[in-house]
C-alpha cells in the first residue's frame, strides 16, 4: 500500500463568473432611451471599470443611431465615439460595454451584431428587447456567451 486512500481524494473546480454590473437608474436610462427611439435601434456606450471578469458600469454615454438602416442596425458616428472615449478618459474610465436595442425582436445578438462584436474585443454587449422589455448581455470569446447582468 502506498499510503494514499483514493476514496478521500477530492476534485475542486473554480467557476469564473462573467457579469456586467449596473444600477437600476442606469437600466431605467437605457430603457427610456430605447423606448424613445421607437422602431429604430438605440445605442449607447457604457463607461466604467473592468476588473477580472466583471465590468462595472459607472456612466452611460447615450448616442444617436447614425446608421442608414436604423430599424435593423445601429452605428455610432465617429464623432460620438471620439466624444465617448474622451469622456471616459476624463473620468479615468474605460469602455466596458456597448448597448443597443432590438425594437421588434428578442434580446439576442444578430449575425451583424456577432460580426461587430469581433471588432470590439472582449467588451460585453447589452441588448434590450422591445418585444419582451428585457435586457440580456453577451460577450464574444471563442463563441458568443450570455453573461449575467447584476443590478446593484
Predicted regions mapped to residue ranges:
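Conserved beta-strand-loop surface patch within small alpha/beta domains used
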Residues: 9-95, 104-152
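Short, well-ordered beta-to-alpha junction loops that form the rim of enzyme active sites
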Residues: 101
Amino acid at each position: 500500500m502506498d499510503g494514499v486512500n483514493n476514496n478521500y481524494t477530492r476534485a475542486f473546480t473554480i467557476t469564473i463568473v462573467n457579469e456586467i454590473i449596473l444600477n437600476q437608474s442606469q437600466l431605467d436610462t437605457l430603457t427610456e432611451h430605447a423606448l424613445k427611439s421607437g422602431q429604430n435601434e438605440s445605442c449607447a456606450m457604457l463607461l466604467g471599470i473592468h476588473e477580472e471578469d466583471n465590468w462595472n458600469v459607472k456612466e452611460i454615454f447615450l448616442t444617436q443611431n447614425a446608421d442608414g438602416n436604423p430599424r435593423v442596425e445601429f452605428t455610432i458616428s465617429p464623432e460620438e465615439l471620439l466624444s465617448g472615449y474622451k469622456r471616459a478618459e476624463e473620468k479615468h474610465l474605460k469602455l466596458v460595454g456597448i448597448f443597443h436595442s432590438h425594437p421588434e425582436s428578442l434580446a439576442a445578438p444578430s449575425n451583424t451584431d456577432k460580426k461587430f462584436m469581433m471588432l470590439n474585443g472582449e467588451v460585453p454587449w447589452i441588448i434590450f428587447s422591445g418585444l419582451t422589455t428585457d435586457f440580456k448581455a453577451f460577450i464574444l470569446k471563442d463563441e458568443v456567451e450570455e453573461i449575467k447582468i447584476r443590478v446593484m
